[in-house]
Amino acid sequence: MGRKWNNIKEKKASKDASTSRIYARFGKEIYVAAKQGEPDPESNRALKVVLERAKTYSVPKAIIDRAIDKAKGGSDETFSDLRYEGFGPNGSMIIVDALTNNVNRTAPEVRAAFNKNGGNMGVSGSVAYMFDPTAVFGLEGKSSDEVLEILMEADVDVRDILEEDGAVIVYADAEQFHAVQEALKNGGVSEFTVAELTMLPQNEVTLTEDVQAQFEKLIDALEDLDDVQQVYHNVDLGE
């Protein structure tokens, strides 16, 4: 699959830790999930998935509780899920997922980030068809064969199971997130190094060193926007 998930998560967490941006993003996502359904994760599948993802980033309990309490308290703040698609240099493709309380603010900010950093926004659907919605799990302490056996016994289908730097990485269809995680937990997995819902590129491209530097600047500009939750792309950054 070309991506070292533990490295990517650690790099992202390291980048965001100084500003607590990652905590703020999870706080927003938890609030939205809790407000759209029940504030109890046992009866709200979407909320449970967000909380499981937040756990792998060590999001403080206080932030989680505050977001859920805000939803319980009947806050009238509403957010919209938005997806933008675009292109970077040399055939690179980018998907930007945002969660915003002001649609009129977000679109111009995303467009400006593209335009100022050598990219351009495309129309809806222009690149998403080249990505697959994917659940990704990372775990340690078991071999890929042991993980495969656990999943087979639970009758849960996955796309691939790989070993990476002492960890096992499991790829599955996005809608299988809960089924895969429950099967692994029932099979004795107590902690996950990675638990993500992502858009995985069907094919990756490589860029020359100078072009990659420009591309990374574009990705940084998009990720630095407050309304942006996730940025996906099809470039092999050598991580």
Curated annotation (Swiss-Prot):
MF-aspect GO terms: DNA binding
GO biological process: regulation of DNA-templated transcription
InterPro entries: Integrase-like_N (IPR017856), TACO1_YebC-like_2nd/3rd_dom (IPR048300), TACO1_YebC_N (IPR049083), Transcrip_reg_TACO1-like (IPR002876), Transcrip_reg_TACO1-like_dom3 (IPR026564), Transcrip_reg_TACO1_YeeN (IPR026562), YebC-like (IPR029072)
Sorted UniProt keywords: Cytoplasm, DNA-binding, Transcription, Transcription regulation
GO cellular-component term (any): cytosol
Keyword Transferase applies: no
UniProt-listed Pfam families: TACO1_YebC_N, Transcrip_reg
Protein family: Belongs to the TACO1 family. YeeN subfamily.
NCBIfam families, per the entry: PRK00110.1 (NF001030), PRK12378.1 (NF009044), YebC/PmpR family DNA-binding transcriptional regulator (TIGR01033)
Name of this protein: Probable transcriptional regulatory protein BBR47_14810
Organism in which the protein naturally occurs: Brevibacillus brevis (strain 47 / JCM 6285 / NBRC 100599)
